[in-house]
Amino acid sequence: MAVAALEQEILILRKRRQLYSLIGLLLVVAVLVSGFSKSNEMNSGGFLQGLSKFFDYPGEIVAEAWQAGPAFFGLILTFVPAMLETLNIAAVATLLGGAMAVVLAMASTRNVDSWGPLIPVVRRIMDITRAFPELIIALFLIFVLGSSPVPAMIAVAVHTAGALGKLFSEVNENIDRKPIEGLSACGASWLQRIRYAVMPQVAPNYLSYFLLRLEINVRASAILGFVGAGGIGQELRRTIGWGQGAGDETAAIFVLLFCTIMMIDQVSSYLRGKLVGSGRAH
């Protein structure tokens, strides 16, 4: 009897859970439909009208690239300098942001004996740097510094410092404290404990997150070109703005971006796998 009653109770709970899930799903669908209808009304029905032409522009780009013939590959080469500029922005920003992230992570983690009153202050600083997207920071800096790669580099570096700082601090919280306590008992300073007890433990994970962030920053640097921050994004904005007649150049930029990001992703994934594997081995 007790088993039958328990099975009946489980069945009731399961049906109740399914009912709640269905109600939640219906509410989400209702909100999405309502929001879409309102947005479409504000846009004078432009979304549905434009949906029928969704593939028109990509079709024009492909057609113009096909008409270019072998010269299309020459077009790809003409945009390599702009792509290198984007890679430089991403690399420098990742290096600067990564260096700042290490400092922020070490100053915001109790597990590495950081100064107590400083920890919440540094954590709030990291929250602030993560709160603003790179695009918003870049727009502000372009207004102050003018259109150049420098605002993009600073914007990506600031956001990287906050994002990596958070990840690095979580890595710090999971380290073994025995080496730190041993060096502390020997009279080692805080910097010596960080260098000889903390960094050997966290370095593989730090580098893995660093490489992952480099992938993200390459994409971010390309997007920032749309707001005048230089690089391949600025060239893409120019070719798209010209419309018909520049479709082959637009296609060349897309191909170059795709190949570059794919190559970076593959190399980064391979290196991160090696780093994480070596970290576990130790």
For every predicted segment, state its role.
Residues 1-95, 107, 111, 276-282:
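N-terminal, non-cleaved signal-anchor transmembrane helix
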Residues 34-41, 130, 138-146, 240, ...:
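A structural signal for multi-pass alpha-helical bundles of membrane permease subunits
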Residues 102-107, 167-174, 178, 217, ...:
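Membrane-spanning helices that line or support transport/gating and their immediate boundary helices
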Residues 126-160:
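Generic hydrophobic transmembrane alpha-helix motif, especially the helices
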Residues 147-198, 204-213, 266:
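Membrane-cytosol interface at the C-terminal ends of specific transmembrane alpha-helices
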Residues 251-282:
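C-terminal transmembrane helix and the adjacent membrane-cytosol boundary/short C-terminal tail
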